[in-house]
Curated annotation (Swiss-Prot):
Binding site for [4Fe-4S] cluster: C577, C580, C585
The protein's name in its UniProt record: Phosphomethylpyrimidine synthase
Protein species of origin: Polaromonas naphthalenivorans (strain CJ2)
Pfam family, one: ThiC_Rad_SAM
GO CC terms, sorted: cytosol
Annotated gene: thiC
Length: 638
């Protein structure tokens, strides 16, 4: 087992993190109703379109494109970042203004105090960890509670601005661009304009969640719900084999650079508590965990030795650090375990298998299920969101949509109602491995059983033959399930089922899933989603190569692939690429056809659409070619 050095190399950590903006992009901020609501976007600068008019060429300006940006200050060159101190508490003033929380005199968790008082760990700890806060006696500090009181919080206004994708930009572009394709939302209620009131209403109904622990004020508020943009989660975390705090913080920054909307810390190695603190203090996105993993470490990996008291202490420990959502497998009940006996791959969820083993060892109902109301009391005191785990999810397409999976799903619906009674936010985790023809049924059953609580799925993988390429097979399932109504997709990397992902694997998984999420947004008709596609297509047709690179979901790779065969700078203004060459480029030929039609007008056309070749011109062209053929001796091959 690899041992962690009992220190953190701050210089190494700072040097690891990629800070440069994307090519041709800059960070901009849109201000809300108050100066401290500053919503980030990535603005892509575009070059002019060159329009030939006879012997003259005029320029048409292309307005910049603004994109959703979850990368935080890490892509803002103007920001000052000190990893050892963490990010600025963006939401600190908002939390204090509500006057319903209080600073604690110390850490409540027994394990947290034990770690704090261990002098051997002093070099691992963050020197500037904040004092934890908790709801005042009798108070509920969840965003759902505020929403149900009719209160629009600054977080809700922030989210509305963010989700709107700068609608003014949409109106300007629609005046000059093609009308977006009509989507099919399968019953979702996506408005043309996202308002703060709409955000409040969706959270109050339980159809959306805002994961924002009061002890994680560094977060830039975001929302998860099927009436909003589809979000993507990335998993990071140490293991018994690798356990560097520096590596995990770097993976966090790397993940959000490539579009992770939330990050789960699934650490199972050493110094989980300290690793999580560094991640939280430097994360502008919500952080989720699976608390049972750390609880298991506290009993030396013996599931049968777990107790409610140990688990409860772990929840409080992590809530006071600032974890925004907990995956809790409370739906794995004793009676459901035998339902997995005839499965091809049994129980594949780590959390699910831990709880199944505990239930069988004691022949008792799960302590997570039995103590669920007490868990709700903890969650609402810190505003931690439930991510109710699918511990009985299928681990192969042979086991998809079986009795065990759906029995647990109905229990998750029951638990959702209990959580909502406490005004605690809930999302529901889903599979897994599901063949394409069964994907839609998963969403339909989840919406019904769990009362439209947001669905959060791992993939699903739609085939089991793709080790090494599971990010591709699962992204296919993810695009479909996102279209049908899933609110957040948990990424899969090329290393799924094979090993712990490295930095490049994280990027590959995120790119695949950001494409899947965007495809889902297009399919369900999310307003403004198609602007990005139109901008890429226009740049491609006009041979604005630099703009194509800038607008690509992965600019670095797009440019690198182009330059492999056409590396010279003049190739970036050429009207062809290496695929077809200069004589067979369809877009170049299409432009020539348009220009030919413009210079040879006729009153008789095949259609009235702009750019269609006049019919007389087509006929004369046919005659010319026929005459050439006759003069050539009527030979097909010469």
């Amino acid at each position: 087992m690899a041992k962690t050095n009992l220190s953190v190399d701050a210089a190494d950590l700072t040097s690891r993190i990629t800070r440069t903006p994307f090519p041709g992009s800059r960070k901009i901020y849109i201000e809300g109703s108050r100066p401290d609501i500053r919503v980030p976007f990535r603005e892509v600068t575009l070059t002019d379109t060159l329009v030939a008019e006879g012997s003259e060429t005029r320029r048409e300006a292309n307005p910049p494109l603004r994109l959703f940006d979850s990368s935080g200050v890490y892509t803002d060159p103007a920001a000052s970042i000190d990893i050892t101190r963490g990010l600025s508490p963006l939401r600190g003033a908002w939390i204090n203004e509500r006057q319903d929380t209080e600073a604690l005199p110390g850490i409540s968790s027994a394990y947290g105090r034990e770690r704090l008082n261990d002098p051997a760990l002093s070099a691992l700890r963050m020197a500037h960890a904040p004092v934890p806060r908790r709801a005042k006696a009798g108070a509920n500090v969840s965003q759902m509670h505020y929403a149900r009181q009719g209160i629009i919080t600054p977080e809700m206004e922030y989210i509305a601005i963010r989700e709107n994708l700068v609608r003014a930009q949409l109106a300007e572009r629609l005046a000059t661009e093609r009308v977006p394709k009509t989507g099919h939302s399968f019953g979702a209620s996506i408005p043309k304009d996202i308002t703060a009131e709409f955000v409040r209403d969706e959270v109050a109904r339980g159809r959306a969640v805002i994961p924002n622990n009061i002890n994680h004020p560094e977060t830039e508020p975001m929302i998860i719900g099927r009436n909003f943009l589809i979000k993507v989660n990335a998993n990071i975390g140490n293991s018994a084999v690798t356990s560097s705090i520096e590596e995990e913080v770097d993976k966090l920054a790397w993940s959000i650079r490539w579009g992770a909307d939330t990050v789960m810390d699934l650490s199972t190695g050493e110094n989980i508590h300290e690793t999580r603190e560094w991640i939280l203090r430097n994360s502008p996105v919500p952080i989720g965990t699976v608390p049972i993993y750390q609880a298991l470490e506290k009993v030396n990996g013996k599931a049968e030795d777990l107790t409610w008291e140990i688990f409860r202490d772990t929840l409080i420990e992590q809530a006071e650090q600032g974890v925004d959502y907990f995956t809790i497998h409370a739906g794995v009940r004793l009676a459901y375990v035998p339902l997995t006996a005839n499965r091809l791959t049994g129980i594949v969820s780590r959390g699910g298998s831990i709880m199944a083993k505990w239930c069988l060892s004691h022949h008792k109902e799960s302590f997570l299920y039995e103590h669920f109301e007490e868990i709700c009391e903890i969650m609402k005191a810190y505003d931690v969101c439930f991510s109710l785990g699918d511990g009985l999810r299928p681990g192969s397409i042979a086991d998809a949509n079986d009795e065990a999976q759906f029995a647990e799903l109905h229990t998750l619906g029951e638990l959702t109602q209990i959580a909502w009674k406490h005004d605690v936010q809930v999302m529901i985790e889903g599979p897994g491995h599901v063949p394409l023809q069964l994907v839609k049924e998963n969403v339909e059953k989840q919406l019904e059983a769990c009362f439209e609580a947001p669905f959060y799925t791992l993939g699903p993988l739609i085939t089991d033959i793709s080790p090494g390429y599971d990010h591709i097979s699962s992204a296919m399932g993810a695009a479909n399930i996102g279209w049908y109504g899933t609110a957040m997709l948990c990424y899969v990397t090329p290393k799924e089922h094979l090993g712990l992902p490295n930095r490049d694997d994280v990027k590959q998984g995120l790119i695949a899933y950001k494409i899947a999420a965007h495809a889902g947004d297009l399919a369900k008709g999310y307003p403004g989603a198609q602007m990005w596609d139109n901008a890429v297509s226009k740049a491609r047709f006009e041979f604005r190569w630099e703009d194509q690179f800038r607008l690509a979901i992965d600019p670095d790779t797009a440019m690198a692939y182009h330059d492999e065969t056409l590396p010279k700078e003049n190739a970036k203004v050429a009207h062809f690429c290496s695929m077809c060459g200069p004589k067979f480029c369809s877009m170049k030929i299409s432009q020539e056809v348009r220009e030919f039609a413009r210079l040879n007008p006729s009153t008789t056309t095949l259609a009235k659409a702009p750019g269609v070749i006049p019919i007389q011109q087509v006929s004369s062209g046919f005659e010319e070619k026929a005459e050439e053929f006759r003069k050539g001796g009527n030979e097909i091959y010469s």
